[in-house]
Amino acid sequence: MGLLDRLSVLLGLKKKEVHVLCLGLDNSGKTTIINKLKPSNAQSQNILPTIGFSIEKFKSSSLSFTVFDMSGQGRYRNLWEHYYKEGQAIIFVIDSSDRLRMVVAKEELDTLLNHPDIKHRRIPILFFANKMDLRDAVTSVKVSQLLCLENIKDKPWHICASDAIKGEGLQEGVDWLQDQIQTVKT
């Protein structure tokens, strides 16, 4: 980044660009969350399951996010690791109403946290305990317990209860992530 670029970021004329990986099992609501974070005139009306990955952009008050929305289908999860080096933050989405697949989500999270490109970095991780509007949903505290999030000691993390369709809980998460990105060097 050149001197003028740095100066424009400091003065707030240009937003710092951040690469974020959006991970989680299929049907957890990753694409719906990312879509809801975009300006209303840029949101898609029909959300389809992501095949492979897609790249989406949205802005917060001081950052410009480039989000790699990674497919959570089993056959595509091995692609995640190819993007770990580039990621400056992670959004991990969990379907809080799907207790049966919580074990699989924990396995994928453990694999992520132990990967060499992630393990030794203080990369912030935002967890969305999504689909809180559904009758079978467990609380974000219970999701945290089921995923053993308290064992994550070397990375800043935060969990937010969310309802991606209504947009509830999303801004809280993005605000936390923005604060972490601005203070944590990955």
Swiss-Prot record:
Principal location listed in the UniProt entry: membrane
Record's bilayer topology term: Peripheral membrane protein
Disulfide-linked positions: none
Lipid-substituted positions (N-myristoyl glycine): G2
An example Gene Ontology biological process: fat cell differentiation
Localization annotation: Cell projection, Cilium membrane; Cytoplasm, Cytoskeleton, Cilium axoneme; Cytoplasm, Cytoskeleton, Cilium basal body
Keyword field: Bardet-Biedl syndrome, Cell membrane, Cell projection, Ciliopathy, Cilium biogenesis/degradation, Cytoplasm, Cytoskeleton, Disease variant, GTP-binding, Intellectual disability, Lipoprotein, Magnesium, Membrane, Metal-binding, Myristate, Nucleotide-binding, Obesity, Protein transport, Retinitis pigmentosa, Sensory transduction, Transport, Vision
One GO CC term, this protein: microtubule cytoskeleton
Molecular function GO labels: GTP binding; GTPase activity; metal ion binding; phospholipid binding
Binding sites annotated in the UniProt record for Mg(2+): T31, T50
Residues annotated as binding GTP: 24-31, 50, 69-73, 130-133, 164
Function summary: Involved in membrane protein trafficking at the base of the ciliary organelle. Mediates recruitment onto plasma membrane of the BBSome complex which would constitute a coat complex required for sorting of specific membrane proteins to the primary cilia. Together with BBS1, is necessary for correct trafficking of PKD1 to primary cilia. Together with the BBSome complex and LTZL1, controls SMO ciliary trafficking and contributes to the sonic hedgehog (SHH) pathway regulation. May regulate cilia assembly and disassembly and subsequent ciliary signaling events such as the Wnt signaling cascade.
Similarity remark: Belongs to the small GTPase superfamily. Arf family.
Disease as annotated in the protein's UniProt record: Bardet-Biedl syndrome 3: A syndrome characterized by usually severe pigmentary retinopathy, early-onset obesity, polydactyly, hypogenitalism, renal malformation and intellectual disability. Secondary features include diabetes mellitus, hypertension and congenital heart disease. Bardet-Biedl syndrome inheritance is autosomal recessive, but three mutated alleles (two at one locus, and a third at a second locus) may be required for clinical manifestation of some forms of the disease. Retinitis pigmentosa 55: A retinal dystrophy belonging to the group of pigmentary retinopathies. Retinitis pigmentosa is characterized by retinal pigment deposits visible on fundus examination and primary loss of rod photoreceptor cells followed by secondary loss of cone photoreceptors. Patients typically have night vision blindness and loss of midperipheral visual field. As their condition progresses, they lose their far peripheral visual field and eventually central vision as well.
PANTHER family hit by this protein: ADP RIBOSYLATION FACTOR-RELATED (PTHR11711)
Subunit field text: Interacts with SEC61B, ARL6IP1, ARL6IP2, ARL6IP3, ARL6IP4 ARL6IP5 and ARL6IP6. Interacts (GTP-bound form) with the BBSome a complex that contains BBS1, BBS2, BBS4, BBS5, BBS7, BBS8/TTC8, BBS9 and BBIP10. Interacts (GTP-free form) with IFT27.
Listed name of the protein: ADP-ribosylation factor-like protein 6
